[in-house]
């Protein structure tokens, strides 16, 4: 009987210089000549454990999965004081380097340098992770076979003001300062379409058990540092135009999933705008907006349908 673990843990020094990054690679059921690996980039103020069930679903569909806790998140923090912190400077750039290293670490555990196995990578970024993933796909050396963006956003006219304000806070309070004003600017309207909200995070999903688990988890829902907000808004600014879409290789197909009750996605308008930028620049894009869905499509009450749609899309673009 096969007793192998379903994932291997890897660690490496973060390019942000904030400490060690911890990640996992979930092994595919079979090692074919081509291994297709889904690299997941999680969202703001959460961690990779929240994706365990989805990762195992993808494995059952025949894929390998790579995921890591980003700097300032989950097991990649040295202490609670480091939560929501990508470093005092250049975090918006160095976090992308960690994406590269995480995939390289996963590849080492999926293949032997002497064999002929080939790894094709798909990216899946959620929320903040979708901004990072969108920016990563525009890199000239990204080498991504396809991308999935969940809970993403269109252009936000307040981004420039937010970056300016974060810079002022950093100057006078320090990069690690946690500003209630910055938090309020980023999230104050998230519950406006939920009149019966029980908690500050009901906008995430209609699944109450998942909301309650998120609220009870000290590694979720914390206030970002001022530098963390600056980096978050910088990512969004860099991907909020057709110019970004023009930098994404046209041969990279894209799937966008979102809920029409997601405030981060402007209630469906943001993902639709992102899809339009991609379509106008010649990309093959599929946009799925789920009725009644809130921010976390992967954790919604209709998540089995969402997971199935993602797997079907991956199979359509598979080389296997």
List where the protein language model places each region.
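Catalytic active-site module of serine/aspartate enzymes centered on a nucleophile-bearing elbow/loop
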Residues: 281-320
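Active-site glycine-rich loops that stabilize anionic/oxyanionic intermediates
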Residues: 35, 42-46, 127-128, 260-261
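Alpha/beta-hydrolase active-site loop
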Residues: 87-109
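Alpha/beta-hydrolase-fold enzymes
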Residues: 133-219
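Alpha/beta-hydrolase fold nucleophile elbow
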Residues: 111-127
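Conserved alpha/beta-hydrolase
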Residues: 50-81
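N-terminal cap/lid segment of alpha/beta-hydrolase-fold proteins
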Residues: 1-30
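Short beta-strand/loop motif that positions the catalytic acidic residue
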Residues: 256-258
């Amino acid at each position: 009987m096969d007793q192998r673990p379903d994932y291997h843990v890897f660690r490496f020094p973060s390019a942000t210089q904030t400490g060690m990054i911890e990640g996992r690679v979930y092994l595919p059921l079979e090692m074919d000549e081509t291994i297709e690996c889904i690299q997941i980039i999680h969202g703001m103020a959460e961690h990779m454990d929240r994706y365990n069930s989805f990762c195992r679903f993808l494995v059952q569909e025949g894929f390998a999965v790579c995921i890591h806790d980003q700097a300032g998140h989950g097991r990649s923090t040295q202490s609670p004081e480091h939560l929501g912190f990508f470093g005092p400077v250049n975090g918006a750039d160095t976090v992308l380097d960690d994406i590269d290293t995480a995939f390289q670490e996963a590849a080492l555990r999926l293949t032997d340098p002497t064999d002929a196995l080939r790894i094709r990578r798909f990216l899946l970024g959620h929320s903040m992770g979708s901004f990072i993933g969108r920016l990563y796909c525009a890199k000239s050396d990204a080498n991504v076979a396809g991308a999935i963006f969940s809970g993403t956003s269109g252009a936000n006219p307040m981004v420039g003001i937010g970056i300016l304000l974060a810079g002022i806070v950093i100057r006078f309070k320090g990069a690690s300062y946690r500003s209630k004003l910055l938090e309020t600017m980023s999230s104050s309207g998230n519950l406006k379409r939920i009149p019966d909200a029980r908690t500050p995070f009901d906008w995430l999903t209609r699944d109450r058990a998942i909301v309650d688990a998120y609220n009870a988890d000290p590694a979720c829902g914390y206030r970002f540092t001022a530098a963390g907000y600056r980096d978050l808004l910088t990512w969004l600014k860099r991907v909020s135009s057709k110019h970004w879409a023009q930098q994404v290789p046209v041969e990279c197909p894209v799937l966008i999933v979102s809920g029409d009750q997601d405030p981060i996605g402007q209630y469906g308008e943001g993902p639709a705008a992102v899809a339009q930028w991609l379509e106008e620049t010649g990309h093959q894009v599929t946009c799925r907006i789920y009725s009644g869905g809130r921010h976390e499509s992967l954790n919604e009450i209709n998540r089995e349908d969402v997971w199935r749609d993602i797997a079907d899309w991956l199979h359509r673009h598979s080389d296997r």
